[in-house]
Amino acid sequence: MQIFVKTLTGKTITLEVEGSDNIENVKAKIQDKEGIPPDQQRLIFAGKQLEDGRTLSDYNIQKESTLHLVLRLRGGMQIFVKTLTGKTITLEVEGSDNIENVKAKIQDKEGIPPDQQRLIFAGKQLEDGRTLSDYNIQKESTLHLVLRLRGGMQIFVKTLTGKTITLEVEGSDNIENVKAKIQDKEGIPPDQQRLIFAGKQLEDGRTLSDYNIQKESTLHLVLRLRGGMQIFVKTLTGKTITLEVEGSDNIENVKAKIQDKEGIPPDQQRLIFAGKQLEDGRTLSDYNIQKESTLHLVLRLRGGMQIFVKTLTGKTITLEVEGSDNIENVKAKIQDKEGIPPDQQRLIFAGKQLEDGRTLSDYNIQKESTLHLVLRLRGGMQIFVKTLTGKTITLEVEGSDNIENVKAKIQDKEGIPPDQQRLIFAGKQLEDGRTLSDYNIQKESTLHLVLRLRGGMQIFVKTLTGKTITLEVEGSDNIENVKAKIQDKEGIPPDQQRLIFAGKQLEDGRTLSDYNIQKESTLHLVLRLRGGN
């Protein structure tokens, strides 16, 4: 009988065989035709690798069956790489390949830059300079691929014993997150960790960026012995600050710690505990202040008042102002604190935008009022893009920007090529040539980003039972590939499948593009009963 052998290059070889031929004989015939030594051949049928000692009949290989030929590199092996989306990639590697080589192979297959790849095996992150053999990665091992979004980085944490821990972090991680990562690695509870950078103790609520901690910075980890304690300071706004103190700290020290956290000068602070105002020269122990006690902070303002400014990110800034301050002064104070130029600030109170020449009193802004700060782009606006991982990206855009421009901005921020991005707004996929205004996308609208695998698309296959299967395909896939994907999902052998589109039966050797099958097209699957035509 005749059988076909399909290579990874897409070439199909025809062989004359008997059902009683064993797999070694078949490999010898392939060697005669193609010159490929048997020990470099792996034959696959119905998803299974065929063993040399077995016969074609053992595997129920019949006339006109198609086997798949995969080359096994000398000393080489196959390993699998599983992504967070559940997709599994097969790679041909050598044990001597280093991790950089492996990342380059993944880039060839998937288009993901190596610097955005983190590979995990047996719970360990693999380092670029090491080889697969160093990690005892053997044939058919599975690695896990995690994407490191741009803005991710490594930092080091050095303990008093001299041990150095490596952590994967984002600049936006707060110190609590970092302590939790240290707990995961080392088992040290966060409340016993003190982290020091550039001589300063890092506070839980602040982020790495707040301290200008950049990639490959080294933090120092000091264990906090019980004997130090935490106390709380509650402000009139209801905000609670946590301080690390000793019973022997005097009240001046405590006010200095509050200044470090909140920027309030000690001479404007009054601290109250158990109804008493605390005096600078006395200690916490003098007042019997113990761990987890709560002090109350009252501000002593010179004819001034505090107001709050809330940003779109949810951050609240506290400003010291006078009712007679004009809006320009207020913007200048915000620039001092946050570095945002006044001409990019819009301040909103009670739904009204505040004008530079007017004063706070003109708008009846009183102590502890909250203003809202919106950034004004020159002629532009901010929109948000939410990814499937739940991350939200902020983009500066113009209504006249077309969707291609927006995808380019996302590539700048996240490194995702535009051809892998699908943007959805109000349930519609956005087309490259149209503008944001065409879709009535306005300031602070949220788009949703879905990743499209390279050149890939989804199609649907509907069975006679009414079940619909979703497949990830490329336009260049031939009908055999599609039937193999259906076999993977549903277990139906390709030779029992007939696929119909637009009333036509699809032929194995043709591609989806040949039939003008586009994304989200629906094919119909009809079963061909054995012994039938």
From Swiss-Prot:
Pfam families listed in its UniProt record: ubiquitin
Keyword annotations: Cytoplasm, Isopeptide bond, Nucleus, Repeat, Ubl conjugation
Gene Ontology MF: a single term: ubiquitin protein ligase binding
Keyword Amino-acid biosynthesis: no
PROSITE patterns with a match to the protein in the record: UBIQUITIN_1 (PS00299), UBIQUITIN_2 (PS50053)
Cross-link position per record: Glycyl lysine isopeptide (Gly-Lys) (interchain with K-? in acceptor proteins): 76
Major location category of this protein: cytoplasm
Superkingdom to which the source organism belongs: Eukaryota
Gene3D superfamilies reported in the protein's UniProt record: Phosphatidylinositol 3-kinase Catalytic Subunit, Chain A, domain 1
Record domain Ubiquitin-like: where: 1-76, 77-152, 153-228, 229-304, 305-380, 381-456, 457-532
Propeptide residue range(s): 533
Chain positions of cross-link Glycyl lysine isopeptide (Lys-Gly) (interchain with G-Cter in ubiquitin): 48
GO biological process: modification-dependent protein catabolic process; protein ubiquitination
Localisation per UniProt entry: Cytoplasm; Nucleus
Note: Ubiquitin is synthesized as a polyubiquitin precursor with exact head to tail repeats. Some ubiquitin genes contain a single copy of ubiquitin fused to a ribosomal protein. In D.discoideum there are 9 genes: ubqA: 5 copies of Ub and a final Asn; ubqB: 1 copy of Ub and ribosomal protein eL40; ubqC: 1 copy of Ub and ribosomal protein eS31; ubqD: 3 copies of Ub and a final Leu; ubqF: 7 copies of Ub and a final Asn; ubqG: 5 copies of Ub and a final Leu; ubqH: 5 copies of Ub and a final Asn; ubqI: 4 copies of Ub and a final Asn; ubqJ: 4 copies of Ub and a final Asn.
Family of the protein in this entry: Belongs to the ubiquitin family.
Purpose: Ubiquitin exists either covalently attached to another protein, or free (unanchored). When covalently bound, it is conjugated to target proteins via an isopeptide bond either as a monomer (monoubiquitin), a polymer linked via different Lys residues of the ubiquitin (polyubiquitin chains) or a linear polymer linked via the initiator Met of the ubiquitin (linear polyubiquitin chains). Polyubiquitin chains, when attached to a target protein, have different functions depending on the Lys residue of the ubiquitin that is linked: Lys-48-linked is involved in protein degradation via the proteasome.
Protein name, per record: Polyubiquitin-F
